[in-house]
Amino acid sequence: MTIEFSNFSFRYESLDKPTLRNINLRIEKGEKIVIIGPSGSGKSTLGQCLNGLIPHAIKGEVSGSLTINGQETATFAMHQFTEQVGTVLQDTDSQFVGLSIGEDIAFALENQLTANIEMYSLVKATAKMVDLEQMLQRSPHDLSGGQKQRVSLAGILVDDVDILLFDEPLAALDPKTGKRTIEIIDDLHRKTGKTVVIIEHRLEDVLHRHVDRIILMDGGEIIADTTPDELLASPLLAQYGIREPLYLTALKSAGCHLALDDHPSSLSELPLANYQHAMADWFHQANTTSNHIRSETLLDVRNLTYSYDGEKNALEGVSFNVQRGEFVSILGKNGSGKSTITKLIMGVIEPDDGTMHLNGQDLSELTIFERSQKVGVVMQNPNHMISHHMIFDEVAFGLRNRGWDEQQVNDKVLEALELCGLSKYRHWPIEALSYGQKKRVTIASILALEPELLMLDEPTAGQDYRNYTSMLSFIEKLNRELGITVVIISHDMHLVLEYTTRSIVIADSQLVADAPMTDVFSNPALLDRANLTTTSLYELATRLNMAETNAFMQHFIDVEKASRLEKTVERNVA
């Protein structure tokens, strides 16, 4: 089932310029390819052309040709696309049509008037392929993120399509579930010989299993069509703002030259003996870092317990504290209870048991509004927080609610916008901003209120590496220069490793660890319990037989932090 784009371009109806430009790409039957690129590069648009959403659901101007199995798709009806291309979306909830898993998998067969006896055996066989055969009576909406993806996958496998398209399948998954998803996709690819196309930001996670080719896109064009080894041996990832595997960053920091023949796409195949001396010398340059923790407690949580349904606890007896000026992470798999902590601190829900004190004051004595003056929360999606048309008015909203006079409001808003690098946009409409800039507006709105604690819920969600690095470097600067206390809630292991100093780990509604981040990340048993995984930095240290794994990881963190600080200084000078 060959796919071929020839001189293919596409322009959205509402835009002046094309989003895809002169795409020439051939994907052979049975290949597994990955499409990567920064936000706005055109990779998702390319996927929508492949599955027929463009031009059937999304209108625009198409030029050039797209053929599937030698057939020109310009004349395809929508059903002809769906008979050949099955798509698993990032938002799996939007794909469910049945009340039970069995009904959802059977949907396509019912449309084809398949006999019940045949349908039953096909549904059972397909469910078994994705390890769901014991769950056919359950509602898909009651499942975890990884289980939901398997239901969506089964729904297209039962239709026996030849091409499987995955649009950012790892975006909402915790590390262990994401790893399992890549393994399931790989198993299906090897067993069925289907053509697999994966659109994804998280390149290192996708490379957990073999892929044939990687397509790098930027500005609506194909920049590179190459093997994983060729791409990772080149400077293209850094040039186009794509996060490279952590082990490669560490090796390059030590001055190790990585050639194509070294197989840089696979840590297990790298000739690490060749780099042993360079890595040892690099590590011996390390200065002993002591993350000084201030003795003054800002947030004190004791025996926090909460249940959404009165039966199963979302949190059970959780206790921890956050010192003033710390940069802390709360880790855990999807559904572990970590976001419940944010809701309890905000006052959106009240605990069944336990206490929360901020700067010595019992939060239960404060209203939601009063808490919002002390605790600033940045949600995953900035569009859920924004309520005004203009940037200035959005940042001024909280101050005006406090009854400040307009001159005070003006001065404070300009100060917050300047701090967030948005002062030149103060008279702009919010719709004109990028996703990352909108996030900065929400942060500016919170900083204007001078909160004592800043909490960010999954700050990397929906952002590519370049955008989220820019935002987190900014948050790091606020923490370093203004002493703002920051708590990040995430399951992005790279983010937590590079930016935070201490990790609070939640698993199955309970606190299982509260320790320096390097201690947590060098404890495979603990990470496994929390449905997290060790990073490739830890794997590299282990394979190099580093006796002090924690110190090795800390040195890497210090080097990266110094590099970020140096780049910030250079930008300020420029």
UniProtKB/Swiss-Prot annotation:
Its main location: membrane. It is found in: Cell inner membrane. Gene3D superfamilies: P-loop containing nucleotide triphosphate hydrolases (3.40.50.300). Its EC number is 7.-.-.-. It is a peripheral membrane protein. Residues 3-244, 299-533 form the ABC transporter domain. The keyword Repeat applies. One of its GO terms (molecular function) is ATP hydrolysis activity. ATP 2 binds at G332, K333, N334, G335, S336, G337, K338, S339. GO terms for cellular component: ATP-binding cassette (ABC) transporter complex. It is an enzyme of class 7 (translocase). ATP 1 binds at G37, P38, S39, G40, S41, G42, K43, S44. Keywords: ATP-binding, Cell inner membrane, Cell membrane, Membrane, Nucleotide-binding, Repeat, Translocase, Transport. SUPFAM superfamilies: P-loop containing nucleoside triphosphate hydrolases (SSF52540). Belongs to the ABC transporter superfamily. Probably part of an ABC transporter complex. Responsible for energy coupling to the transport system. This is Putative ABC transporter ATP-binding protein VVA0347.
